[in-house]
Amino acid sequence: MLKIILISFLFVINLYSSEVYLLPKQSDDAESKISELIQEADSEIFIAMYNFSYKKFANDLIEASKHGVRITVLFDQKKTKKDDEILDLLRENGIKTVVNKDKNKMHLKVVLIDSKTAIIGSTNWTKESFEENYDLIYITDDKKLILKLKEFMSKI
């Protein structure tokens, strides 16, 4: 009986794959993984990012868009007033950008890729966040979590 319980437990644990990156120590690995996931996207990427000024990821998104991936990036209105270089770059390259005009701050750091992968955490997409900050990035294919994130973000 104990064997059955242990096997069942191990199956449930391995049902979803996930990775955690602790920055700044694992910044290079996290950057590489995010770029890889963007490049491997098949159909769609949805991003809600409070602070997005890292050109490396913008260029990855532009390349994915050129290969037919539909991309939407949600920005916070107050933050884009201060720095809109990435917003303009993405728009110029045909990527759909949405600026949250709600009175509430859009402080999310969420990426959904093909409704199969979620990237969440405390990390903004800025060079400083990857080089100087203590931050966390969590990547998962947990279907329940992805569905919950999609539902939540569709209401913003």
Residue ranges of each PLM-predicted region?
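A general structural motif
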Residues: 24-30, 54
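Signature of lipid phosphatidyltransferase scaffolds
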Residues: 30, 118-156
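Primarily the HKD phosphodiesterase
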Residues: 34-92
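Structural recognition of the beta-strand scaffold that forms the well-ordered cores
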Residues: 46-48, 72-75, 98, 118-120, ...
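Ligand-binding grooves and catalytic loops that recognize ribose/phosphate and carbohydrate rings
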Residues: 81-112
